[in-house]
A protein has these predicted regions:
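Redox- and metal-dependent alpha/beta enzyme cores, enriched for Fe-S-associated oxidoreductases
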Residues: 1-56, 60-63
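Glycan-processing catalytic domains of CAZymes
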Residues: 31, 46-47, 75, 110, ...
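Acidic-and-aromatic substrate-binding clefts and catalytic sites of carbohydrate-active enzymes
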Residues: 54-56, 84-88, 113-117
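A short, acidic, amphipathic alpha-helical segment used as a generic capping/interface helix at domain edges
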Residues: 55-72, 89-90
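Acidic beta-strand-to-loop metal/phosphate-binding motif
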Residues: 73-82
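Peripheral docking tails and interdomain loops at the edges
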Residues: 92-133
Length: 133
């Protein structure tokens, strides 16, 4: 997906996917000394993750709006994995919040198969062209 965006004239300045920046946010507190404290610190770190599985999840929308401002984002590509019902459920709320904030949004769904590549390239290219107008 990043390659398609960048070869279509866009720039990925930030991302909020499951395996992306979330992995590095809210690191585990390593100052705990007992096993119980360490397990609690690990649990707290996982529970701070703003994932669609914690619906309703206003924290995720707040994070997205913060990132749009912080990284001066022109438009958001909201991509979800096909058949990930949790992200599909949240897609409407995310799109509405971003549009209300004046940020253009392109919602995509893919299974990351090679057969999706050209359709994604067409939609992403049109979105980037719209942002540049």
């Amino acid at each position: 997906l990043h390659n398609i965006i960048e070869t279509s004239g866009g720039a990925v300045v930030c991302e909020e996917m499951c395996t992306g920046t979330r992995y590095f946010e809210n690191l585990v507190d390593e100052s705990k000394t007992t096993l119980d404290e360490q397990f609690m610190a690990l649990s707290e770190r996982y529970m701070k993750t703003n994932c669609a599985c914690f619906t309703p999840n206003t924290g995720r929308i707040d994070d997205l709006l913060r990132m749009v401002k912080e990284y001066k984002i022109d438009g958001v590509i909201d991509c979800s994995l096909k058949f990930c019902c949790l992200y599909d459920t949240e897609k409407y709320s995310v799109s509405r919040a971003l549009k209300e904030a004046g940020t253009p949004v392109l919602s995509l769904e893919t299974d990351y198969a090679d057969t999706d590549a050209e359709q994604l390239r067409t939609r992403i290219g049109a979105f980037i062209e719209m942002l540049n107008d």
